[in-house]
Amino acid sequence: MPKPFAIHPGEILLTEFMEPLDLTIYRLAKEIGVPLPRINDVVKGRRSISADTALRLGIFFGLPAQFWLNLQNDYDLRLASTNTLSKIKPYKAA
C-alpha cells in the first residue's frame, strides 16, 4: 500500500498565503515576531508548525490557530501511515 499523499503545511503557507500576498519569508517572520530561520524552515518543509507559530500565523492571517495545527496534524498522520500499521488488528475483548 503506497503512502497517502501528504503536503507539508509550509508548502500551503507559501503557495496559498505568502505568494498571493507577495510576502517574503523575511517580511512574514518580522511581522509575526519570530526568527527568520523558523519561517524559512517551515516553508522548506524542514520544520513543523508549532502551537506558538500557529497562534502567530492565525492572528496575522485572520484564521484560527487550529487551522494551522490541523494542517500539521494531517501531514504528520499521513506520513505515519505505513504498511506496518496494517498488520495491527483491533483488540477484541473475550
Which residue stretches match the model-derived regions?
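Short, charged recognition helix plus adjacent turn
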Residues: L69-A94
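A contiguous, mid-protein "functional segment" used to position or interact
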Residues: R56-D76
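The alpha-helix within a helix-turn-helix
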Residues: M18, A29, G58
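A short, Lys/Arg-rich alpha-helix, primarily the initiator
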Residues: M1-L23
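Short alpha-helical DNA-recognition segment
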Residues: L23-D41
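Short, basic-rich loop-to-helix N-cap that marks the start of a DNA-contacting helix
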Residues: R46-I59
